[in-house]
Amino acid sequence: MNDAFSTAQHRLDALGLRCPEPVMMVRKTVRQMAAGETLLIIADDPATTRDIPSFCEFMDHTLIASETTQTPYHYLIKKGL
């Protein structure tokens, strides 16, 4: 796993959840974070490989890193302003 993931300030376990639940949980968690804070998301739903990058782009957050070659998938996002 990428070392960047170990620096996350928040963590969200979305294992076992299916679309649209992972993105709904990410949205709820990010709302409670301050701008610039980071969130590690761990998921196993294949739809997250599309949904999480799209969510970040749409909501102006930064997808810092992702590992999607095998499950569980890992995403590190930084909350935008």
Swiss-Prot record:
It comes from the Bacteria. Keywords: Cytoplasm. GO terms for biological process: tRNA wobble position uridine thiolation. One of its GO terms (cellular component) is cytoplasm. Its main location: cytoplasm. InterPro entries: Sulphur_carrier_TusA (IPR022931), TusA-like (IPR001455), TusA-like_sf (IPR036868). The active site is at 19 (cysteine persulfide intermediate). This is Sulfur carrier protein TusA. It comes from Shewanella baltica (strain OS185).
